[in-house]
C-alpha cells in the first residue's frame, strides 16, 4: 500500500567557514599571525576591567568551530570589532570561546561535553580564541593548550578540501532568515575543504511518511543512522587527537585509475529551473586512529573514522510527455564490507512550481518516478553504511508533449479589387491569415502587372500600394508560421483608366404663362457632367421658327424671355464638357390668351359695438382677383351722420365717431381691366349696459405678535367693464395704531405694519368707469405675543444707526456669557430707536431643545445682578436700563405697575418702602400703609422730643451747680488748721460745715487747682476767718467733718 511521503532536507548541523587561501606563501600567514598577536596584546592591555572576569587563553589560527548539538553557537549582531567580540564573550557567562571569521564574531558555549568540535580551515582569516573563566576551564571540550601545535602541524592536502555543509544552526542572535541568507552567501564564496574531528555516532529514527510537495513515496518506514559528514564531495579527514601519533599519512581508499578523476562541484541556481551536475569520484583520505585518552569531546571512547563513499546517481534524464515515468539507479563505487549493506535515501531538492508525481522505492537503490508533470526535478541520494557516507545528484527534465503543427492559412482581403483613375493607391490586408500557433513572417510579391521600373516586394501583413498605373496586377502573399510551415495565396487588382462620361443637359420643366404676362426665365443650371460643363447655349427650336420673342443670356445657364405672344415656344439647351462632348435638352413655354374675371370684393363679417366704444376697423384684404386688384374704396351707405372714414382708399379702413344705430359700409374693388365688385358690412352700435362692480376681500386675517404686518387682498374684486379705483378705509372702532405701506390703500392689496393687539376692521370700496361702486368688509385680528411676559428690553447707550450686525453679535455674545447660555439661545425680537442717542433691544432667552423660554423677570434680575458684579466697561455698550417689556411688579397687592416707568403706583393710603428700594433689590413696591407711617412717625417724633428735653434738662442741671472754691491760708506753726465755709446770700441753700484743712487736704486740693485761691493779703491785714473759734451762724448746726477720702469723692 502506497503512502504519500514528504522529502525534507536532512537537518544536519552546519557551521560557517571563511575563505581558504590556496597559496603556498607562508610569509603572508606569518605576517598576519604577528599582526593578530600584536592586536591581542593591545586588547589585553586596554581591558583591565575585564581581566578579573576572564583571561585570554591561547589563540589558534586556521581552525574553525562546529557545534555537536543545537544552539551551542550564536552570531553576534552588527559588524563588531575584534576587541568588542572579545569583550562581549567575556561579559557573557555562557561564552567560553569565540571564533573570529572575516569580521564576524561567532561565540560558543562549550561547557558540556561533546558540545563543540574543532576543525582545521588553514585560513589566516579564521581564528579561534579560548577564554579562561571561573570554573569553566575544565569543562571545555577542546584540546589542551599544549596540544594546539598538534593541530597546526597536520599535513593537509589543500587540493582535496571542500567546504563542509551546514550541520548545526547558530543560536538565534539574529533572525533565522538573516542567518540563512548569510550562510548561503558564505557558501557561494567557495573555500577549501575542511577536516572534521570524529564524533560519536548517534542513532535516531526518521519518519519516512512526511510529505514533500506533490510527490508521493511508497514503502514502509525505516530506521536510519544519523551520521555527521564533512562535505558532499566525499572527503574523509580525521585530525590527530591529543595523545595520538603526530605523524599522519594520507592513504587513498579508492582503486587506481579513479584517483585522478576530476571532481566537479554542484551547480545550483536560485531560479525556478535548477541544474545539478552529478558528483564524480573524489579521493578519500584517512589518518591514524586517535588514542582513547584525548578527544575534543573529553571522552575516553575512540571515535570511528567516517568513510566517504563515491556515489553516482547516473546521468541526467530527459523525457518527453506523454512518457511520464523514469527509473533512477544509485551506484556506489566502494563495495560494502561483508555482511553489511548500504542504506539509500532519495530526496527531492528542486522541482517546478505546480508539480505532481509519485515516488516508489525512496529508500532503495532504484527510485521509480511516475505521473510526472513538465519541469526540472533535481534528486539527491544519500548512501550510508557502517562508518561510511556518500551523496549523489541527478536531474530529471520532463518536457511537455510536442505540438503537432498545422500549416498556416494565408488570407487576403479583398481578393479581387478594381479601382479607376485618378485613384492610384489602395491596400490589401493579409493580417487575417491564421495559424494554430503563430505566424512569424509575411511576404508579398508582385507576380503580374504592367511594366514599371520596380516590382513590389514587401514583408508586412498589410500591403500598401501607391502610384499605380492602369493595368491588371496579381500579388502573392506567403506566410510562415513558428514551425517553418508556409502557405500562399494571391490577390488580383485591376486599375482602370479614367472614364469621361458625356454631360447631361437639363433645361428645366415646361412652363405655362397667361397674358398679359409675357416674360419668363428658364434655368439650365441643373445640367451635370462628371468633369464639369464648359459652355451653355440656348436656341429657339426649329419648330418655333418665326415666333416673336426677345432672348437674353443665351450663353449662360439662365435664359430670360420677354415680349412673348400667344402660342407655344420650344427652346433647346446645348451643354459642352471638357473634352467637347455635348448634350441637348428642350423646354416648352406655353403662352395662353388673356382670360380676365371680375374681382371678388369681401368687406368682412358684420360687427356689433357697445358704447363707449365708438370706433372700429373695416377689413377688405380678403378680396381677390384672377389678375390684380388695383383700387379699394370704402363708403358709408346707411346710418347716422357724423362718422369719419380714415384710409378709405386702402384695403383696411378705420371708422370713428359712431353713435347708437346701424351702419352699412360698402367696399368697391377694381382690377386692371377696370372690372369691379362690391361688398357691404353692417356695424351695429348699441347703448352701454353697465353692471356695478363686485368688491371681494379674500378672507379675514389673524396674526400673532410679534408679527405686526399683514396684507389684505382685494384683487378678486370684479366688474364687467373694469375697476378704475380701490379705496381701503379703517373702521372707527379699530385701533388707531398701524401704518399703511406705500399708499397701498389705493391698490387692490393693502399692506399694513406696526399693528398692535386688537381687532381691526377695514372696508374696501371699488369703483368702475361709470362711477358705480361696491364695498366689502374684513377684519384683522392681532393676538397678543405669547412670549410677552418673558420679553426683556435693554436700553443701550448707542444710536440705532451705529448698531451694526457685527456689534449686535458681540453684544449678544456678552449677554450670553452673563446669563450662562449659548448665543443661539438669545432670540432678538426687535431693535428700534429709544431716543436720539439710545436704542432699545427686545429679546427673550430659551434653552436648548425643547426650547423652554426663561421667565423675563428672572432674566432681567440676573442681568442686573451680574452687571453689578462686573466692571463698568464689561459690555461694549453701556446698559442704561434693563427691564421686562411688560411691567410685572405686583406692588405688594396695594397698587398697579406703570408700564412706561416700570414703577408701582400705589393705592390711596399706601406708599413705597423706600428703605427696601434703596438698600435691597431696588424693586418698586407698596408695602407701607400711610396711616401706619404717620403713626410711626408721630411716635418717633414724640420720642425724639422727650429724649431731647431730657438731655437738655440734664445739661442745664449740670451747669446750675455752684462750684466750690477752697481758700487756703498759710498758718503759723501755732495756729490750727481751719476752713471757713462762707455763707451764700441766697436763701434756701444749705450751708456746709467747715472742713478742717490739713496738709493732706492741701495736697488733695491741688487736683482742683483752678479753684484754689491763696489769700495772702487777708493774713497780712489780720482778718479772721468766720467760725475760727468754732462758732456757727445762728440757726445752723455744725456739719460733721468729712474725711479726706470723702472729700475727694
From Swiss-Prot:
PANTHER family: DYSLEXIA-ASSOCIATED PROTEIN KIAA0319-LIKE PROTEIN, FI19480P1. It is found in: Cytoplasmic granule membrane; Golgi apparatus membrane; Golgi apparatus, trans-Golgi network membrane; Cell membrane. The modification Phosphoserine is found at residues 978, 1009, 1031. GO terms for cellular component: cytoplasmic vesicle; Golgi membrane; nucleolus; plasma membrane; trans-Golgi network. Keywords: Cell membrane, Glycoprotein, Golgi apparatus, Membrane, Phosphoprotein, Repeat, Transmembrane, Transmembrane helix. GO terms for biological process: flagellated sperm motility; neuron migration; proacrosomal vesicle fusion; receptor-mediated endocytosis of virus by host cell; response to auditory stimulus. InterPro entries: Ig-like_fold (IPR013783), KIAA0319-like (IPR029865), KIAA0319-like_C (IPR056502), MANSC_dom (IPR013980), PKD/Chitinase_dom (IPR022409), PKD_dom (IPR000601), PKD_dom_sf (IPR035986). It is a multi-pass membrane protein. The modification Phosphothreonine is found at residues 974, 1037. The keyword Iron does not apply. Residues 49-127 form the MANSC domain. Residues 310-401, 409-498, 504-594, 600-688, 694-785 form the PKD domain. This is Dyslexia-associated protein KIAA0319-like protein. Residues 51-932 are extracellular. N-glycosylated. Residues 1-29, 954-1049 are cytoplasmic. CDD domains: PKD (cd00146). It comes from Pongo abelii. Residues 1028-1037 have a biased composition (Polar residues). Glycans are attached at residues 247, 395, 487. Pfam families: K319L-like_PKD, KIAA0319, KIAA0319_N. Signal peptide: none annotated. Possible role in axon guidance through interaction with RTN4R.
